[in-house]
Amino acid sequence: MITIGIETSCDETSVSLLEDGNKILSNLVSSQVEIHKTFGGVVPEVASRIHVEVLNRLIELALEKAKKEFTDIDLIAVTQGPGLIGALWIGIMAAKTLSLALNKPLIGVNHLEGHIFANFLGEDPPTFPFIALIVSGGHTEYILVEDIGVYKILGQTLDDAAGEAFDKVARILGLNYPGGPEIDKISKMGKPIFNFPKIKCDRELDISFSGIKTAVLYLVRDLKKEGKEIPVADIAASFQERVVEELLERAFLALNKFNIKTLVVSGGVASNSYLQRRFKEESRKEGIKLYIPPPYLCTDNGAMIACAGYHLYQKGYKSDLYLSANPDLLLGER
């Protein structure tokens, strides 16, 4: 079965062809990072315009790379939300057009669902139930995944997502956008010598990054007032360590609470080298089976959408031509 996956929820246009739910035939990504870097963040209007410019050609190129024709497509999967409303509609209209023209089934996919299913793109997928941690530019959530399409949110960010916090702290430190890779890189040259405050929330699996972000801001401000040099690498390493340790602590709280031995981590921040090292260390120590996709599947991509769409369709889920973009789509909402 050939599934085409279309992802346009934010600033990446991506199209993928997948065979039988796990074999990637093509996975093309057109990134807008260099364009949005000028503005220090994603400009929704600009993102939508670029999706319009590149999507049709990207679909053709994905088919060429997979050595497939339009008539070979059996299922069309597309990101329905959450995301930027204009950007989402570009992908959905393309998917609807394909569905109508080819008379093939259509399935709307939650973007977060896609990140979870990025871990199913291989020969040894996770078995249910498992705990999923999604850490990206727009989301930080702990999820109990009981089955395909059956999710329970256990905890989430109360303010910034992890990736957003990385971007804001990078800006405070004078680093380039996007901040995650910049902090990851410069942290290797520093030491975590600053003790940023632990995160405290009323619910044990919720998380908040505003306190750490403010602590970084005040530290930099005070050092400047005193005329001291800003130890950017040390501050970055200290911030990164605190964020990762907080994410790790809550992940293992969730595993212990539900007596589960499988942990799935995905989203753009999951490609952070320190995060990967710490999660692997702790998982080995505690006997937890850990899944983290390769970096190219951590960031937004069409393959994860095709994979999620395939599994949802096999489970009996499907959409129709009334499918709409939903920028606030909840996980599990159909």
From Swiss-Prot:
Task: Classify the main location.
Answer: cytoplasm
PROSITE patterns (alphabetical): GLYCOPROTEASE
- Transmembrane segment boundaries: none
Record-level GO BP terms: tRNA threonylcarbamoyladenosine modification
- Quote the cofactor binding remark: Binds 1 Fe(2+) ion per subunit.
Q: Which GO terms describe its molecular function?
A: iron ion binding; N(6)-L-threonylcarbamoyladenine synthase activity
Quote the subcellular location field of this record.
Cytoplasm
Q: Which domain of life is it from?
A: Bacteria
| Top-level class of the enzyme under EC nomenclature | transferase
Q: Can you tell me which residues bind substrate?
A: 134-138, 167, 180, 184, 272
Residues engaged in binding Fe cation = 111, 115, 300
GO cellular component terms, alphabetically, are: cytoplasm
Look up the record and name the cofactor or cofactors this protein needs: Fe(2+)
Reaction it catalyzes? L-threonylcarbamoyladenylate + adenosine(37) in tRNA = N(6)-L-threonylcarbamoyladenosine(37) in tRNA + AMP + H(+)
Keywords in alphabetical order, please. Answer: Acyltransferase, Cytoplasm, Iron, Metal-binding, Transferase, tRNA processing
Tell whether Cell cycle is among the UniProt keywords: no
User: Which EC numbers does the record give?
Assistant: 2.3.1.234
Q: What PANTHER family does the entry give?
A: TRNA N6-ADENOSINE THREONYLCARBAMOYLTRANSFERASE, TRNA N6-ADENOSINE THREONYLCARBAMOYLTRANSFERASE, MITOCHONDRIAL
Question: What family is reported?
Answer: Belongs to the KAE1 / TsaD family.
Function according to Swiss-Prot or TrEMBL: Required for the formation of a threonylcarbamoyl group on adenosine at position 37 (t(6)A37) in tRNAs that read codons beginning with adenine. Is involved in the transfer of the threonylcarbamoyl moiety of threonylcarbamoyl-AMP (TC-AMP) to the N6 group of A37, together with TsaE and TsaB. TsaD likely plays a direct catalytic role in this reaction.
Name of the featured protein:
tRNA N6-adenosine threonylcarbamoyltransferase
- Which organism is this protein's natural source? Dictyoglomus turgidum (strain DSM 6724 / Z-1310)
